[in-house]
Amino acid sequence: MKLRLQGNSVRLRLTRSEVERLLDTGLVEESVDFGAGEVLAYRLHSGLEPGPVQAVFRQGSVTVSVSTEDAQAWAGTDEVGIYTQSGVLAISIEKDFRCLTRPLNRQEPDAYPHPGQPSETRL
């Protein structure tokens, strides 16, 4: 799972296996160890009752929560992502697509086929 922070926005990008793990277990998490005991953890949690996507930051950890219903609906379609605004914070949860400019032999095999890529060049 990739995390992108820019201004007042949080974006999570998930590969196919991470989306499946979210549906199966309700949790996908990663961390970055900066050394000296400083770790940034980030996670996507599903299982909330129906309602808006939420994000919280506590004790060096970013947690984005989405309802199971919304996660299942998104995962089962061609929709790229779930997008919401929570106060001043924009939250995006997206499927991670293959890069259009990276050589095919260097693609991430678990990424989703890019919708802008001709079907004969999709892996």
Protein language model features and the residues they cover:
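Compositionally biased, non-globular sequence tracts
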Residues: M1-R4, S9, R13-L123
